[in-house]
Regions:
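Expand to "…catalyze enediolate/carbanion chemistry for C-C bond making/breaking, isomerization
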Residues: 1-152
Length: 152
């Protein structure tokens, strides 16, 4: 059985989306990591506006706290228009968190902690990713993402 579950959420009902990611978060808690380690929820029909997506992420983080999953499950965010604070929309480093569709990546906190322990320079990863994007250049990175979008 695969350790990564991919869910394509169809529709634009945010209440159903919340129910879906909560169900998947609970499945992570209830399933051993050797069977299910992480879940990607792909959102081709909803939250295409980045600000609305960020609002949904904020609400989802609040819900994690309310259902006592804060510190157990993390939500990593990926969006076609992802933009870090203090960057311009065209800055290539934004592409480290860009994806063909909005996505919610549900991670086990314990797995993230194991990765941190196993990789002593964990804090270097974001800078290394930005360096990679800068080496590739904006034109090449945009072309790679466009190629993915054309195949979908």
């Amino acid at each position: 059985m695969p350790q990564i579950r991919y869910i394509v959420f169809e529709g634009n009902d945010l209440e159903k989306l919340t129910e879906t990611w909560l169900k998947e978060a609970n499945a992570l808690v209830e399933t051993t990591p050797s069977v299910l380690e992480t879940t990607l929820i792909i959102l081709p029909e909803v939250l295409d506006e980045f600000e609305a997506y960020l609002d949904f992420i904020d609400m989802s983080e609040f819900i994690l706290e309310e259902v006592d999953l804060d510190g157990v499950i993390q939500i990593a965010s990926f969006h076609p228009d992802y933009q870090f604070d203090e960057t311009e929309p065209t800055d290539v480093e934004n592409y480290t968190n860009r994806s063909p569709f909005p996505m919610l990546h549900l991670l086990r906190e314990e797995s993230v902690n194991r990765a941190i322990e196993a990789y002593p320079e964990i804090g270097d990863i974001p800078d290394n990713n930005i360096d990679t994007m800068n080496k590739l250049g904006l034109t090449r990175v945009k072309q790679m993402l466009d190629d993915i979008n054309r195949t979908n």
